[in-house]
Amino acid sequence: DKPAITYTCYLYVQLLTDFIRDIIGGKTDIVATGASVSFVTAACQNIADQIGHIILVCPESIRTLAKAPNHKSKLLASIINLPIYGTFIYNVGARNTALSDSAECRYLYSSILGHYTTVNIAHCLEGLTTSIAVISGKNAPETFEKAEEYCNVLPSIEHIEIAGCGLLPQRENADAFLEQIDILLSDNC
């Protein structure tokens, strides 16, 4: 169940930070995909000494993640949070997506549409010394452009393209993906 709150990037960063500190209790490697890369990079800025490697799989563009809530997005989030109209809009929007059928998910959905879960990670990336790699699919040219955005902000980021896949290399070419993960996480890197 997802409570009726506004989900923010800070909430996810705090959850991730607490999980690494309190549950894992040591240095860890993180693989993140899509929009969740903002949570990981922001958490790394807070606890860089406890993160060994970060692997970003087809990350969302830095420009998209830099969007902040504005009047229009706040209004949209408020409308989706309304009991009857919001549930209807959520059901129409979620019908063709992979979102859950549970009505409680609409609060997360409204937070995403309202840009509450995004953060400008360019500032987070600039100061990181953690080993970072971006994996993208060769069949999706937009992922290459997004990876280049990351490399332009932090030139030490390694970019790897996996052949025979698009937006989901971890599913579309799992063997090649796992091979790259093994190479990146080996002690020799």
Which positions does each model-derived feature cover?
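Flexible "cap/lid" loop of the alpha/beta hydrolase fold
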Residues: 5, 41-46, 50-81
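Catalytic active-site module of serine/aspartate enzymes centered on a nucleophile-bearing elbow/loop
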Residues: 157-189
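Active-site loop/oxyanion-hole signature of alpha/beta-hydrolase fold enzymes
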Residues: 1-29, 179
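Conserved loop-alpha-helix segment in the C-terminal half of the alpha/beta-hydrolase fold
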Residues: 133-165, 171
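Conserved alpha/beta-hydrolase fold motif
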Residues: 30-31, 54
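Conserved alpha/beta-hydrolase catalytic His-Asp/Glu region
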Residues: 64-130
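Short, hydrophobic alpha-helix immediately C-terminal to the catalytic nucleophile
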Residues: 17, 40-45, 178
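Gly/Ala-rich beta-loop-alpha elbow adjacent to hydrolase catalytic centers
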Residues: 31-40
